[in-house]
């Protein structure tokens, strides 16, 4: 099943870190180093995904190499974890639902600064290295909030597996609510501040308008990704996709559903821009750490559109005759 992905116009782009291609190569080196990729495996498919180029959108244009390298290994870990634990018709690498729950428990231990329960597991070993690198790079950041969002990410992932096993897409409303957690977008907002060195005030982060701005940005980012990933996920038996949900529950063709999702993206972007414009009048000037936080929300929005369209991550491999 393929669709013609509607073009999204997201006029929020900015210059990115110039070493994205170097970071792509580093992703391969790191994946091999932690055992998530065999030494003899062809590097070309990973390079074509462009994990380093995506990471280059999430750090400051003049950020240090160490900052870009960290964001790159984070993107690499997310991709491998997602493929091994979530994106399958039931279980992948022999992982049952119970084993995924146990994996999540083990990953939670790592995030509490405890040794990996099974250091022979490359997923655990990879996260342990990501966590060590992050805590060596960032200081005075909201670790507790990040751990909380990550545990919710894992919970949403198990919800996704339930839907896959049933073979029934969730309703659009249910999908939208859980998708924000299942994509770990809120966790990325915290990491953006940690690695790029800005610290928005708590009063700003707790403001109703800023929280809603984050929700609008998270929705746009998630839905744009759903549009581009639909064909690949459909082939893999995934049902946790807004295109699938709209098709199944609203009786539209897949193309009509994709067009509907694109329209929802456009409306969410318009609402985001409208709300952003009001922030200064609410006592939240878009300067300093606040302005940088808002900039990161937008980096995730536009880069998801740009990277998803260019990356081989969502290419569909034709079925064998």
Swiss-Prot record:
* Residues that coordinate or bind Mg(2+) 2: 82
Motif range for NDxxSxxxD/E motif?
225-233
| Pathway of action | Secondary metabolite biosynthesis; terpenoid biosynthesis
Q: Which UniProt keywords apply?
A: Lyase, Magnesium, Metal-binding, Plasmid
Cofactors that this protein relies on: Mg(2+)
Reported EC number(s) for this entry are 4.2.3.201, 4.2.3.202, 4.2.3.203
Kindly state the positions of the motif DDxx(x)D/E motif in this protein. 82-87
- Show the SUPFAM superfamilies listed in the entry: Terpenoid synthases
- Cite the cofactor comment: Binds 3 Mg(2+) ions per subunit.
Q: Which residues bind Mg(2+) 3?
A: 225, 229, 233
For molecular function, the Gene Ontology terms on record are: metal ion binding; terpene synthase activity
The entry's Mg(2+) 1-binding residues are 82
Reactions it catalyzes = (2E,6E,10E)-geranylgeranyl diphosphate = hydropyrene + diphosphate; (2E,6E,10E)-geranylgeranyl diphosphate + H2O = hydropyrenol + diphosphate; (2E,6E,10E)-geranylgeranyl diphosphate = isoelisabethatriene + diphosphate
Q: Which family does it belong to?
A: Belongs to the terpene synthase family.
| Domain observations | Contains several highly conserved motifs that are important for catalytic activity including the aspartate-rich 'DDxx(x)D/E' motif and the 'NDxxSxxxD/E' motif, both of which are involved in complexing metal ions to coordinate the binding of the geranylgeranyl diphosphate substrate in the active site.
Its annotated function is as follows: Terpene synthase that catalyzes the conversion of geranylgeranyl diphosphate (GGPP) into a mixture of diterpenes, including hydropyrene (HP), hydropyrenol (HPol), isoelisabethatriene and traces of isoelisabethatriene B. Hydropyrene is the main product. Some other diterpenoids are also produced in very low quantities.
Stated name of the protein:
Hydropyrene synthase
């Amino acid at each position: 099943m393929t669709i013609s992905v509607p073009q999204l116009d997201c006029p929020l782009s900015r210059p990115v870190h110039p070493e994205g291609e170097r970071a792509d190569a580093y992703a391969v080196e790191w994946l091999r180093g932690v055992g998530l990729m065999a030494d003899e495996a062809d590097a070309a498919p990973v390079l074509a995904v462009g994990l380093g180029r995506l990471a280059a959108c999430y750090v400051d244009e003049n950020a240090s190499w160490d900052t870009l390298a960290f964001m790159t290994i984070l993107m690499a870990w997310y991709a491998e974890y997602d493929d091994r634990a979530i994106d399958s018709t039931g279980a992948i690498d022999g992982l049952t639902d119970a084993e995924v729950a146990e994996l999540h428990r083990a990953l939670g231990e790592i995030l509490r600064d405890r040794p990996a329960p099974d250091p022979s597991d490359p997923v655990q070993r990879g996260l342990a290295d990501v966590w060590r690198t992050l805590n060596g790079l960032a200081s005075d950041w909201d670790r507790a909030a990040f751990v909380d969002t990550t545990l919710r990410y894992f919970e949403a992932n198990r919800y996704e597996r339930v839907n896959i096993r049933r073979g029934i897409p969730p309703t659009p409303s249910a999908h939208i609510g859980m998708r924000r957690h299942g994509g770990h977008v809120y966790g990325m907002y915290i990491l953006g501040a940690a690695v790029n060195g800005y610290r928005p005030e708590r009063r700003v982060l707790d403001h109703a308008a800023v929280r809603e701005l984050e929700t609008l940005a998270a929705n746009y980012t998630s839905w744009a990704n759903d549009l581009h990933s639909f064909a690949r996920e459909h082939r893999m038996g995934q049902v946790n996709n807004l295109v699938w949900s709209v098709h199944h529950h609203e009786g539209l063709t897949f193309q009509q559903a994709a067009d509907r999702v694109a329209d929802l993206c456009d409306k969410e972007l318009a609402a985001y821009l409208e709300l952003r414009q009001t922030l200064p009048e609410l006592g939240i000037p878009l300067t300093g750490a606040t302005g940088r936080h808002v900039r990161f929300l937008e980096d995730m929005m536009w880069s998801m559109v740009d990277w998803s369209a260019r990356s081989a991550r969502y290419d569909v491999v034709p079925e064998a005759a």
